[in-house]
Amino acid sequence: MNIENTLLKQDVWRFIDNTTINPAFDAIQSFATDDTLCRSVGARMAPSTVRGWVHEKTVSLGIQDSKLPDIDKGIAFLQKQGYRVVVRNSGGLAVVLDSGVLNLSMVLPDAERGIAIERGYETMFTLIKDMFVDCNEVIEAKEIEDSYCPGSYDLSIQGKKFAGISQRRMAKGVAVQIYLAIDGDQTTRSELIRDFYTISGKAKQTKYTFPDVNPNVMGSLSDLMKNDISLNGTLVRLFNSLRHYAGDLVSGTLTSEELDLFPAYYERLIARNDKVLT
C-alpha cells in the first residue's frame, strides 16, 4: 500500500451532498462549511468527510486577485456577465463555478501534523485517477502555466487542464479541494477569466504574477474523455471509489455541533468579502 492510499483508507467516510443548486446556499457558505469541517474533523468530533458542491455562475477569486490595480472594473465586468463574485479563503487565483463544475472537498484530521502538503495533493490525485480509471489517456498532475489558476497539481489530459487542486489548513484539519470541469464550455470559461484579468489591469502591475490565460490549454472531462460525463455519473464514480477505501460510507449533513460552529466562520468570510469587494 502506498502512502497516499493510507489516507484514503478510513474506518468511516462521511459524504455531504451540496450538489443541488440552491440560490440560498452560495459559495461563501461553501467555504465557511469547509472551515467548519476542518474544525470538527480536526477535533475528531466528526469522521473524515468528502463534500460535493456546485454553485451556478460564480467566480471565486483568490486573495492575490484582490490586489489587481483595477479590480473594481474587473468585478463589475464579471457581474455584468451575470456572475456572482466571491473571495475564497484557500490558495490560488480566479476560477469559474457553474452547473458543469463539480467541486469536491476532502477533509481529514491532522492532529499530529502528519499530512505534508504534497501528501494531501497526492491523495486527491489518487482518488481522481481511481474514479476515472476507465480513461484511455494518462491523467497527469503538472502545472499548466497558461490556464486559469495554475498550480503544480493541475490535472490534465494530453496537456489540457480539467481540474485544479488547492488546500485549506486550520484547526488541526486539512481540506483538500478540487474543481472538476465535468462538462460545459471550458473555452468560454477561460475567455471570461482572461478578459477579467485584462480589464482588472493585470498589465499595469509587476508585483504579482497572473496567468496569460489561453483557452486552448483547457477542456472539460466530457470533451477530453470523448464521453458524456455527467455530474451524477461522477458522483457514482466517487461513491464507488470511497466504498473501496472505507470501512463504512455514510451520507449525512452537518451535525448540531457543526451547525453551532458554522456562523462564526461564515461571518468571518462575509467580513473579508465586504472588505475586498466594496
UniProtKB/Swiss-Prot annotation:
L.monocytogenes is a natural lipoic acid auxotroph and relies upon exogenous sources of lipoic acid for growth. Thus, this enzyme has not the same activity as its ortholog in B.subtilis which is involved in the lipoate biosynthesis pathway. The reaction proceeds via a thioester-linked acyl-enzyme intermediate. The record marks 161 as: Lowers pKa of active site Cys. One of its GO terms (biological process) is lipoate biosynthetic process. Residues 44-250 form the BPL/LPL catalytic domain. PROSITE patterns: BPL_LPL_CATALYTIC. It catalyses: N(6)-[(R)-lipoyl]-L-lysyl-[glycine-cleavage complex H protein] + L-lysyl-[lipoyl-carrier protein] = L-lysyl-[glycine-cleavage complex H protein] + N(6)-[(R)-lipoyl]-L-lysyl-[lipoyl-carrier protein]. The keyword Transferase applies. It holds the Pfam family LplA-B_cat. Catalyzes the amidotransfer (transamidation) of the lipoyl moiety from lipoyl-GcvH to the lipoyl domain of the E2 subunit of lipoate-dependent enzymes. Takes part in a pathway for scavenging of lipoic acid derived from eukaryotic host cells. Cannot use lipoyl-tripeptide (DK(L)A), lipoamide (LD), or free lipoate as substrate. Its EC number is 2.3.1.200. Pathway: Protein modification; protein lipoylation via exogenous pathway. Keywords: Acyltransferase, Transferase. NCBIfam families: LipGcvHLiptaseLipL (NF047857). It is an enzyme of class 2 (transferase). The active site is at residue 149. The gene is lipL. One of its GO terms (molecular function) is lipoyltransferase activity. It comes from the Bacteria. This is Lipoyl-[GcvH]:protein N-lipoyltransferase. InterPro entries: aa-tRNA-synth_II/BPL/LPL (IPR045864), BPL_LPL_catalytic (IPR004143), LipL (IPR024897), Octanoyltrans_LipM/LipL (IPR050664). Belongs to the octanoyltransferase LipL family. Disruption phenotype: Strains lacking this gene are attenuated in their ability to grow in bile, but display no growth defect under normal physiological conditions. The reduced tolerance of the mutant strain to acidic bile salts is likely due to a decreased branched fatty acid content of the membrane phospholipids, which results when L.monocytogenes is deficient in lipoic acid.
